[in-house]
Swiss-Prot record:
Keywords: Ribonucleoprotein, Ribosomal protein, RNA-binding, rRNA-binding
Subunit-structure text: Part of the 50S ribosomal subunit. Forms a cluster with proteins L3 and L19. In the 70S ribosome, L14 and L19 interact and together make contacts with the 16S rRNA in bridges B5 and B8.
Family, similarity comment: Belongs to the universal ribosomal protein uL14 family.
Source species taxonomy: Bacteria, Pseudomonadati, Pseudomonadota, Alphaproteobacteria, Hyphomicrobiales
Domain of life where this protein originates: Bacteria
PANTHER family listed in its UniProt record: 50S/60S RIBOSOMAL PROTEIN L14/L23 (PTHR11761), LARGE RIBOSOMAL SUBUNIT PROTEIN UL14M (PTHR11761:SF3)
Transmembrane segments: none
Protein name per its UniProtKB record: Large ribosomal subunit protein uL14
NCBIfam families reported for this sequence: rplN_bact (TIGR01067)
Organism: Bradyrhizobium sp. (strain ORS 278)
């Protein structure tokens, strides 16, 4: 579960390395975000000559969370780190590559571009 002030890794090649959640979108009092949810992030660490720079405020899709993800068949999936993919205002990924596995729950939330770029879908 991601909430305000949560630090996340960036799972794409946009140039950002670490981001911090500053808002969970979807409702006035929404507190937590999970896989597939859109959050507003501030970039805390970035590489030189990247597409984004430190201090930028952008939207991101949460792609990995440490909290258990329960599935309808009773199975549970969990990741080691919290991670997100930066998106623009048209909900398209800023980067051209995605690093690491992503869960298939993203498909239900209509993030098909992220699914197609990911090397592995769990």
């Amino acid at each position: 579960m991601i909430q305000m002030q949560t630090n996340l890794d960036v799972a794409d090649n946009s140039g950002a390395r670490r981001v911090m959640c500053i808002k969970v979108l979807g409702g006035s009092k929404r507190r937590y975000a999970t896989v597939g949810d859109i959050i507003v992030v501030s970039i805390k660490e970035a590489i030189p000559r990247g597409k984004v720079k430190k201090g930028d405020v952008m939207k991101a899709v949460v792609v990995r969370v440490r909290k258990d993800i329960r599935r309808a068949d009773g199975s549970v999936i969990r990741f080691d780190r919290n991670a997100a993919v930066l998106i623009n205002n048209q909900s398209e990924p800023v980067g051209t590559r995605i690093f690491g596995p992503v869960p298939r729950e993203l498909r239900a939330k209509n993030h098909m571009k992220i699914i197609s770029l990911a090397p592995e879908v769990l």
